[in-house]
Amino acid sequence: MAVKIKRDDQVIVITGKDKGKTGTIKTVLSNGKIIIEGVNTVKKHQKPNPQADVAGGIIEQSAPMQISNVAILNSATGKADRVGFRLEDGKKVRFFKSNNELVK
């Protein structure tokens, strides 16, 4: 099955503690999870490492979340939408199912 959500897509969280938040996908992991900028943030306790010039402390970073918990955001309507595939000029392209516009 083809991947309907890719890197740099605008998505909206549809379930969980961050429901309703939007962001851009930074990474798509192979185990069915994604990392979204500014969503699902966790606090990590970082040990100082003088050899790598890394200061210690508590840092916030985005944690992976299930790809099924997000939907792609349609920029024309501002709402969550479903994605389909079709052939145009011999290339497989993604489109929004609500208004048949291509995903940019």
From Swiss-Prot:
One term of GO molecular function: structural constituent of ribosome
Pfam families recorded: KOW (PF00467), ribosomal_L24 (PF17136)
Transmembrane segments: none
Superkingdom classification of source: Bacteria
Cellular component, GO annotation: ribonucleoprotein complex; ribosome
Signal peptide range: none
Classification via InterPro entries: KOW (IPR005824), Rib_uL2_dom2 (IPR014722), Ribosomal_uL24 (IPR003256), Ribosomal_uL24_CS (IPR005825), Ribosomal_uL24_KOW (IPR041988), Translation_prot_SH3-like_sf (IPR008991)
A GO BP annotation: translation
Role played: One of two assembly initiator proteins, it binds directly to the 5'-end of the 23S rRNA, where it nucleates assembly of the 50S subunit. One of the proteins that surrounds the polypeptide exit tunnel on the outside of the subunit.
Stated family: Belongs to the universal ribosomal protein uL24 family.
Subunit structure as annotated in this protein's UniProt entry: Part of the 50S ribosomal subunit.
PANTHER family: MITOCHONDRIAL RIBOSOMAL PROTEIN L24
Protein name: Large ribosomal subunit protein uL24
Organism of derivation: Psychromonas ingrahamii (strain DSM 17664 / CCUG 51855 / 37)
